[in-house]
């Protein structure tokens, strides 16, 4: 029996078969590793790669394209460069380097790519923001007008910081720079400020100690720690501050307040210098690349106080699509960059750069630190250029002459060493100055509420401590505040609620202080 094959049947069967066939092929833009070493890879191909784009190397090593040259791409590796070898295939990912953001990041310790390293499981968040983003333009900003209290008397009285400000903490190693930053973070408890601590090039043990301190004071509830330790590759140390800024921008653009501490930017500059030299970029002063100023300025300009107008805020330049539906006005991002100086040399390249970018600096001096003045702030060259507008009225009133009084005291102190015959006025000035220095001393991790600071500084500047012996000033301060809490809590409450020191409140405070000085001196003599 012969079967005839009809051509139309064959073609219809083939058509059906072809219609059901789906192409599984994926198209990748790939390149080849020409050379690898010191955390840098030269890749041939990838002609469509973008600057800052993530690249996928074998063995799950990620990299980022930094140098886009005529015949190759210079990429930095975020993983172990021994895992990558010559001839390996590199894939473009098509996405720019980004970091996960959101409330789920609070209380966690992560690396600069947002990968948790605290052993508390994965971070549940869908929103990712790019590491690099243009700073908000002038029309989207508002001038700094709200205070960000550090809890440190010397800073809140003479070098006030406002929300949205950039205040540099600068000093030699071991002068208490990190302690000032941590005190500020601890003092934000209950104030609705989210904190980000970025550790760059620190020892792993130091970071563990910082996390431990924050946990002990209940500060990790509203804090994220982003860390690239000294043993991490230089590219991770280079991008760590940008990851901190991206997370801070999430809170800023959703109408909340954030504080980011970069500890410290000297190490980031060193990591960037290392990458730039390995990528054969031309060196400049101190062998740093020519754009090291731009590295820090584009980072610190992202700290801002955003306008209250939501409609204007929604039109913000470079606003990522993921954030657009959540935008609220009135948020702020405050930056506290830290810079380490060598032997107090603030005129070196990186310190002068960052001083010129920021809105003021807190200068910590090793001589003051060693003489027992802690925090070791040199009031003479420390300044806050915009914080004055954010200071509460009460503090402005009581601390108005404090800086001048201290400056005069330092000058007289230097002269008094040469002569013993001092007139009455000079002696009185020296005595008061010594007491002012004493009341500005403060222990580590014991930030003080602003109303208590106002009460103590009021006593110092009004001369109410002149009858208390210098060595007893700290004890007097403790006991006086305890007495205020017990018998005159309404005075502190009034300052806290109104932010001002009314004449009647000041009168009652003065009266209470005068009575207490007599009682205290009698007790000391006894």
UniProtKB/Swiss-Prot annotation:
Residues spanning the membrane: none
Binding site residues for ATP: 171-178
The enzyme's E.C. designation: 7.1.2.2
Gene Ontology molecular function, alphabetical: ADP binding; ATP binding; proton-transporting ATP synthase activity, rotational mechanism
Matches recorded under InterPro entries: ATP_synth_asu-like_sf, ATP_synth_asu_C, ATP_synth_asu_C_sf, ATP_synth_F1_a_nt-bd_dom, ATP_synth_F1_asu, ATPase_a/bsu_AS, ATPase_F1/V1/A1_a/bsu_N, ATPase_F1/V1/A1_a/bsu_N_sf
Localization of this protein: Cell inner membrane
Segments forming a coiled coil: none
Pfam assignment, any one: ATP-synt_ab_N
Cellular compartments per GO CC: plasma membrane; proton-transporting ATP synthase complex
Domain of life from the UniProt record: Bacteria
Keyword Nucleotide-binding: yes
CDD domains xrefs: ATP-synt_F1_alpha_C, ATP-synt_F1_alpha_N, F1-ATPase_alpha_CD
Bilayer topology term: Peripheral membrane protein
Marked site: Required for activity: 382
Keyword Lyase on entry: no
Catalytic activity: ATP + H2O + 4 H(+)(in) = ADP + phosphate + 5 H(+)(out)
UniProt keyword terms in alphabetical order: ATP synthesis, ATP-binding, Cell inner membrane, Cell membrane, CF(1), Hydrogen ion transport, Ion transport, Membrane, Nucleotide-binding, Translocase, Transport
Assembly, per entry: F-type ATPases have 2 components, CF(1) - the catalytic core - and CF(0) - the membrane proton channel. CF(1) has five subunits: alpha(3), beta(3), gamma(1), delta(1), epsilon(1). CF(0) has four main subunits: a(1), b(1), b'(1) and c(9-12).
Family annotation (HAMAP family): ATP_synth_alpha_bact
Family, as annotated: Belongs to the ATPase alpha/beta chains family.
Role this protein plays: Produces ATP from ADP in the presence of a proton gradient across the membrane. The alpha chain is a regulatory subunit.
Name this polypeptide is given: ATP synthase subunit alpha 2
Origin species: Chlorobium luteolum (strain DSM 273 / BCRC 81028 / 2530) (Pelodictyon luteolum)
């Amino acid at each position: 029996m012969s079967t005839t094959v009809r051509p139309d049947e064959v073609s219809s069967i083939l058509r059906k078969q072809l219609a059901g066939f789906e192409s599984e092929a994926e198209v990748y833009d790939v390149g080849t590793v020409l050379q690898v070493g010191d955390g840098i890879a030269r890749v041939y191909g990838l002609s469509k790669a973008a600057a800052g784009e993530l690249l996928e190397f074998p063995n799950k090593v990620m990299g980022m394209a930094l140098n886009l040259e005529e015949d190759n791409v210079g990429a930095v590796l975020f993983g172990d460069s021994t895992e990558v070898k010559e001839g390996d295939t590199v894939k473009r990912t098509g996405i720019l380097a980004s970091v996960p953001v959101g409330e789920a990041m609070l209380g966690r310790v992560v690396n600069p790519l947002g990968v948790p390293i605290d052993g508390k499981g994965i971070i549940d968040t869908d929103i990712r923001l790019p590491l690099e983003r243009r700073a908000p333009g002038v029309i989207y900003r508002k001038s700094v007008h709200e205070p960000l209290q550090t809890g440190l008397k010397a800073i809140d009285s003479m070098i006030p910081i406002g929300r949205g400000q950039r205040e540099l903490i600068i000093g030699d190693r071991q002068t208490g720079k990190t302690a000032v930053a941590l005190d500020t973070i601890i003092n934000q408890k209950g104030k609705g400020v989210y904190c980000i601590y970025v550790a760059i090039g620190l020892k792993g043990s130091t970071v563990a100690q910082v996390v431990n301190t924050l946990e002990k004071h209940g500060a990790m509830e509203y804090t994220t720690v982003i860390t690239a330790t000294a043993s991490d590759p230089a590219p991770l140390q280079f991008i760590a501050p940008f990851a901190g800024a991206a997370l801070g921008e999430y809170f800023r653009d959703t109408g909340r307040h954030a504080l980011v501490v970069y500890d410290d930017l000297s190490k980031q500059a060193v990591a960037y210098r290392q990458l730039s030299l390995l990528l054969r970029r031309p060196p400049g002063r101190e062998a740093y690349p020519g754009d090291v100023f731009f590295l820090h300025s584009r980072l610190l300009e992202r700290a801002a106080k955003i306008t209250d107008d939501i409609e204007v805020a929604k039109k913000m330049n470079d606003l990522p699509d993921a954030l657009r539906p959540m935008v609220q006005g009135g948020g702020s991002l405050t930056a506290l960059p830290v810079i380490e100086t060598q032997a107090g040399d603030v005129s070196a390249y990186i310190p002068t750069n960052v001083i010129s970018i920021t809105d003021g600096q807190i200068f910590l001096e090793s001589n003051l630190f060693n003489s027992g003045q802690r925090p070791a702030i040199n009031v003479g060259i420390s300044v806050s250029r915009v914080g004055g507008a954010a200071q509460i009225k009460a503090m402005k009133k009581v601390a108005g002459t404090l800086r001048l009084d201290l400056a005069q005291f330092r000058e007289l102190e230097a002269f008094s060493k040469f002569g013993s015959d001092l007139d009455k006025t000079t002696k009185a000035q020296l005595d008061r100055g010594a007491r002012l220095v004493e009341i500005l001393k403060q222990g580590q991790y014991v930030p003080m509420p602003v109303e208590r600071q106002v009460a103590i500084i009021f006593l110092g500047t009004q001369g109410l401590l002149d009858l208390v012996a210098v060595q007893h000033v700290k004890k007097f301060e403790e006991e006086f505040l305890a007495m205020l809490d017990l018998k005159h809590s309404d005075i502190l409450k009034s300052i806290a609620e109104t932010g001002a020191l009314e004449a009647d409140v000041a009168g009652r405070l003065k009266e209470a202080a005068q009575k207490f000085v007599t009682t205290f001196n009698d007790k000391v003599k006894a």
